[in-house]
From Swiss-Prot:
CS domain segment(s): 2-89
Role noted for this protein: Co-chaperone for hsp90/daf-21. Involved in regulation of longevity, larval entry and exit from the dauer stage of development and response to environmental cues, such as oxidative stress, in a temperature-dependent manner. Role in daf-16 and hsf-1 inhibition at elevated temperatures.
KO phenotype (gene knockout): Resistant to oxidative and heat stress. At increased temperatures, there is increased longevity and an increased propensity of larvae to form dauer. At decreased temperatures, lifespan is shorter. Defective chemotaxis in response to toxins.
Species of origin: Caenorhabditis elegans
Location of the region described as Disordered in the Swiss-Prot/TrEMBL record: 109-175
Annotated protein name in UniProt: Co-chaperone protein daf-41
Source lineage: Eukaryota, Metazoa, Ecdysozoa, Nematoda, Chromadorea
Amino acid sequence: MAKQPTVLWAQRESLVYLTIEVDEAKIEELKGEGNKLHFQGSSKTDKYEATLEFFDEIDPASVKHTGSSTRVVEITVQKKTPAWWPRLLQNKGKVHWLKVDFGKWKDEDEDDEAEDAGAGIGGGMANGFDLNQYMSQMGGAGGADFGGLEDDEEDDDMPDLEDNEEEEGKNGTRA
């Protein structure tokens, strides 16, 4: 039996971004029709299958995907009628395998088609800037310099904790 992969999604007024989390899977079928999208793929050890029944109709000819990387298949789907959907699926219930892709999410009031024109399917941003690539390069850059925060002479005025415990023992009381 095929496994249901985790699907991440984000939308713009005229399109939907989908990221299907699969482990080194080969795409065997990717088909859009009406308000449905069907994905089927397999890896060396597992078979994956997902059928999404969208909130509204899509343009089946516009379904595009990147070749699967080691972990994900990224898909873009044009909406037949540009409009913000209140949810991705027609069914109002929650499904455990569907999550919001906050890396690509944009609120309705933030939408600017000019920015989207330069956005790539792989999470790229306008003008070719890819935040994911930038962040991966930050790994060995070191942190900010917080000079002067090591020892503060004001701390010398504080009494030692041991002195307080000895005094409490003499008085026979504890705070």
